[in-house]
Every structure is written in C-alpha cells, then in structure tokens.
Swiss-Prot record:
It comes from Geobacillus thermodenitrificans (strain NG80-2). The keyword Metal-binding does not apply. Belongs to the bacterial ribosomal protein bL17 family. PROSITE patterns: RIBOSOMAL_L17 (PS01167). Part of the 50S ribosomal subunit. Contacts protein L32. GO terms for cellular component: cytosolic large ribosomal subunit. The keyword Ribosomal protein applies. GO terms for biological process: translation. This is Large ribosomal subunit protein bL17. Pfam families: Ribosomal_L17. Keywords: Ribonucleoprotein, Ribosomal protein. GO terms for molecular function: structural constituent of ribosome.
Length: 120
C-alpha cells in the first residue's frame, strides 16, 4: 500500500484529507502543497467515482468521509449534495482523471512547493 505520511499521525492525516477533499468539492479549486495535492488527488477520484455510481450505498460511503459543510448558502446545498448533483454528472462520460495540478512557485515562509489543484 503506497501513500504519503505528510508528517502526521493516521488520524491527523485522515482529518487533513477530509478537510481538503471537502474544500475542493465546495470551491472546485484550492491552493496547497504539492505532496498534499498528490495525495488528495486519489481521494477525490474515489469520491467522484462514488458520486457517479449514485446509489444509496455510495452516498453513505461518501457521507462517511466528506464533512457536513454548506457549499451554497443561497440554496442550502451541502458538500455531499453538490458532489452527487453537480460534480458527478459532469464527469459521467469520463473514466478518471477528474483533477488537474498546476505548479506555482515555492511558499515564501519555508520554500515548500505550492500547487493549485482543481477539478477539470
């Protein structure tokens, strides 16, 4: 099993990826470090694939991972609803490769390589 530890314990790493995945679903593009983005890419691919399946079990599996945050305050839509109703239908004919990683410069404070990860 191959994954990045990201300098965290298992629970901290899972919480970080849940937060990043929820933010990416809500905003559709976020700025983060390269290592986090590469690890997030595999998580988001799985979430969108669950969204494309669309059955009750897939919805419950995604709900267990994605945080319960409001994606659109006007409609009251949360992140899970956005994943299943807006994002997943967009990729119905695409088999994977739902994200794009674009490199930015290094972070000013510590020189960490920064990237923008966005939904294609």
């Amino acid at each position: 099993m191959s994954y990045r530890k990201l300098g965290r314990t298992t629970s901290q790493r899972k919480a970080l990826l849940r937060d990043l995945a929820t933010d990416l679903i809500i905003n559709e593009r976020i700025e983060t470090t390269e290592a986090r983005a590469k690890e997030l890419r595999s998580v988001i691919e799985k979430m969108i694939t669950l969204g494309k399946r669309g059955d009750l079990h897939a919805r419950r599996q995604a709900a267990a991972f994605i945080r319960n945050e409001v994606a659109n305050s006007e409609t009251g839509q949360d992140a899970l609803q956005k994943l299943f109703s807006d994002i997943a239908p967009r990729y119905q004919d695409r088999q994977g490769g739902y994200t794009r990683i674009m490199k930015l410069g290094p972070r000013r404070g510590d020189g960490a390589p920064m990237v923008i990860i966005e939904l294609v």
